[in-house]
Amino acid sequence: MAEGSQSAPEAGNDMGNDDAIGGNVSKYIVLPTGYCGQPKKGHLIFDACFESGNLGRVDQVSEFEYDLFIRPDTCNPRFRVWFNFTVENVKESQRVIFNIVNFSKTKSLYRDGMAPMVKSTSRPKWQRLPPKNVYYYRCPDHRKNYVMSFAFCFDREEDIYQFAYCYPYTYTRFQHYLDSLQKRNMDYFFREQLGQSVQQRKLDLLTITSPDNLREGAEQKVVFITGRVHPGETPSSFVCQGIIDFLVSQHPIACVLREYLVFKIAPMLNPDGVYLGNYRCSLMGFDLNRHWLDPSPWVHPTLHGVKQLIVQMYNDPKTSLEFYIDIHAHSTMMNGFMYGNIFEDEERFQRQAIFPKLLCQNAEDFSYSSTSFNRDAVKAGTGRRFLGGLLDHTSYCYTLEVSFYSYIISGTTAAVPYTEEAYMKLGRNVARTFLDYYRLNPVVEKVAIPMPRLRNKEIEVQRRKEKSPPYKHPLLRGPASNYPNSKGDKKSSVNHKDPSTPF
């Protein structure tokens, strides 16, 4: 959750000394008590020593049940939400229950039907587990902390299975994406390195606009967008990519926006935290979104660099910083929505509500009713609050939140789980909304994004998919009663609002 605050007594589940966790597990083999010799098929091997991985400890409870401990953020034991690990050396038809036992938050979308993500080497596309096999409850065996348990059936012995809290989006993937954009040699796309993280990873800054807007002495209307200040909030990167993809496209709306506006985008403010698999903090254990007031060039170098640039633009008489949008993901609420500021100037406050209202009209997954405006003292160090107080009355600062789980279409009660594409679609709709805000509609007709033309072979494949039902993982073919009971699941019930998605 982007702007949520957890004081020490309310930090969530307790983690006692017996739960002390160091780094990630590395090819950790779980052997039965008293067993000697080489591991056999079915003796699971856990690993999280890879980019954005997180799993700190594994305890075998029984032949089929395992307690899994999230590794806390580096240098900060308070935050334990993100997990991302692999399991191999499985046996065909082996059924297991995994219990994530040390979440630092008590409130969770797991209560509403959210489920972990899974993929395997032979099925590399991420999918959500069936909600009917996921349980979220207070567990007496873990000091009545909240535990998330899920049942799973391994079906292919040669596969390596990967489980994650949400769709991963790594630093390396991000760099490859920017490299691919740079190779296109677009005269309206500019990439520069604004600075480096503590571990010397790049702080990329993108500028997307018509070259005419960058000529010396040209006046600029700037929209500044940041993302991934909290590394575990991976939907932020997908939304940001959707914004970028749309702005660099040849869509008529994108062409008009580039002529009228200058988009400055810093898509990954916390590259070290992303790489390390942290949920909220940087390498040194700082929540960067609480240090906008006085960021250190040594401790918070990426934040320091972005703040310096924004202040420099603010002081430039030729530059009008119109918008600042910081993109996050939310762990307890549905839909996309925004946080804004409260101002003494009533007219400015009312004008601030225009953009989210327009976005609500353009994006079915964005909720204006969930959008709120505040000046809570504990949020003073956030980008939204700090810049809202620094910039003048013509500037508007928002936190854009998007659910880790799903959105509810207006007029219905059904929860639609987010996909990578759905997150990126929200990003495209954010970009399109600037056309409405600046009333540029007469310049270009509002048209839907054209569908890509398919070759004959692709058309035939698509037709077959439409005629035949999708492949179902064996996990979905049997009733939930086939799975062994998890500790405490008899007392727990989950109100699942969405249909299960096949793996």
From Swiss-Prot:
Reactions mediated catalytically: (L-glutamyl)(n+1)-gamma-L-glutamyl-L-glutamyl-[protein] + H2O = (L-glutamyl)(n)-gamma-L-glutamyl-L-glutamyl-[protein] + L-glutamate; C-terminal L-alpha-aminoacyl-L-glutamyl-L-glutamyl-[tubulin] + H2O = C-terminal L-alpha-aminoacyl-L-glutamyl-[tubulin] + L-glutamate
Domain of life: Eukaryota
Cofactor(s) listed in the protein's UniProt record: Zn(2+)
Transmembrane parts of this sequence: none
GO biological process: anterograde axonal transport of mitochondrion; C-terminal protein deglutamylation; central nervous system neuron development; defense response to virus; negative regulation of cell population proliferation; positive regulation of ubiquitin-dependent protein catabolic process; protein deglutamylation; protein side chain deglutamylation
Bias type Basic and acidic residues, positions: 459-469, 487-503
PROSITE patterns: PEPTIDASE_M14
Domain Peptidase M14 residue range list: 167-438
Database matches in Pfam families: Pepdidase_M14_N (PF18027), Peptidase_M14 (PF00246)
Key words, A-Z: Carboxypeptidase, Cell projection, Cytoplasm, Cytoskeleton, Golgi apparatus, Hydrolase, Metal-binding, Metalloprotease, Protease, Zinc
Region entry Disordered, spans: 459-503
Gene Ontology CC annotation, any one: cytoplasm
Family: Belongs to the peptidase M14 family.
Subunit-structure text: Interacts with MYLK.
Protein name: Cytosolic carboxypeptidase 6
Chain's gene name: AGBL4
